[in-house]
UniProtKB/Swiss-Prot annotation:
Identification of the protein by name: Fluoride-specific ion channel FluC
Family note: Belongs to the fluoride channel Fluc/FEX (TC 1.A.43) family.
Keywords, sorted A to Z: Cell inner membrane, Cell membrane, Ion channel, Ion transport, Membrane, Metal-binding, Sodium, Transmembrane, Transmembrane helix, Transport
Gene Ontology terms, MF aspect: fluoride channel activity; metal ion binding
Record gene name: fluC
Gene Ontology cellular-component annotations: plasma membrane
Primary location group: membrane
Transmembrane segments: 4-24, 35-55, 67-87, 99-119
PANTHER family: FLUORIDE EXPORT PROTEIN 1-RELATED (PTHR28259:SF1)
Amino acid sequence: MIKVFLLIIGGAIGSALRFGVSTWMQRSMLYSFPFGILSVNVIGSFLIGFCWSIAEAYNFSINTRAFLFTGLFGGFTTFSSFALDTMVLMRTGEYKMALLNVLASNILGLIAVFLGIILGKNIITMIK
């Protein structure tokens, strides 16, 4: 039961953070491109990679992992918003922007996870 509670709390925090970061990023840009969702997905990918490397090194409990990876980062990043933004771009005839969104989200997300893992491992090496 505690794991479910941690998932709910983590998801609520992640969702609130996603709303704030996404809204702020989108307002900062003057283009129709969905920078808000792209930014939370890239930031979240980096953070999940970073936290995963720390969780592996320090054997985080199943409850802590549930809070972080399923709750917090699951609430912060979102595939459904990415898909909706892409479909809206396609429906309005902005096919190049839609393709750019798909490529940027996937490529930058993978790079961000990779960099997060490397940073986490380097920090752990420095600490030990």
